[in-house]
Amino acid sequence: MALSVLRLALLLLAVTFAASLIPQFGLFSKYRTPNCSQYRLPGCPRHFNPVCGSDMSTYANECTLCMKIREGGHNIKIIRNGPC
């Protein structure tokens, strides 16, 4: 009986640990693609609305992320709104 409880506790611990790794490493990612078509060149608005890119860089706003994508041909997604 005690062995069964110990196994169940270890299984629960392992599942909890694995679930904590999912957002950290982007498994089953819900990253979103920035809508770069809404931003005209040149320049971006100066409003501060930071986004965290999948390259783990914080961008001042979605437009500055789109500029980075355009200049380097990178495929950067938005992990979340706010700084990284």
UniProtKB/Swiss-Prot annotation:
Superkingdom of this protein's organism: Eukaryota
InterPro entries recorded: Kazal_dom, Kazal_dom_sf, SPINK2
A single GO cellular-component term on record: extracellular region
Outcome reported for the amino acid change (mutating R46A): Loss of inhibitory activity towards trypsin
Predominant place of localization: secreted
SMART domains (alphabetical): KAZAL (SM00280)
One Pfam family it belongs to: Kazal_1
Site (Reactive bond): R46, H47
Effect of F48A: Reduces inhibitory activity towards trypsin
Subcellular locations according to the entry: Secreted; Cytoplasmic vesicle, Secretory vesicle, Acrosome
Keywords: Cytoplasmic vesicle, Disulfide bond, Protease inhibitor, Pyrrolidone carboxylic acid, Secreted, Serine protease inhibitor, Signal
Listed Gene3D superfamilies: 3.30.60.30
Swiss-Prot/TrEMBL GO biological process terms: acrosome assembly; spermatid development
Pathology linked to this chain's protein: Spermatogenic failure 29: An autosomal recessive infertility disorder caused by spermatogenesis defects that result in non-obstructive azoospermia or oligozoospermia. When produced, spermatozoa are immotile and have abnormal morphology, primarily defects of the acrosome and head-neck junction.
Protein name: Serine protease inhibitor Kazal-type 2
Organism listed in the record: Homo sapiens
Lineage: Eukaryota, Metazoa, Chordata, Craniata, Vertebrata
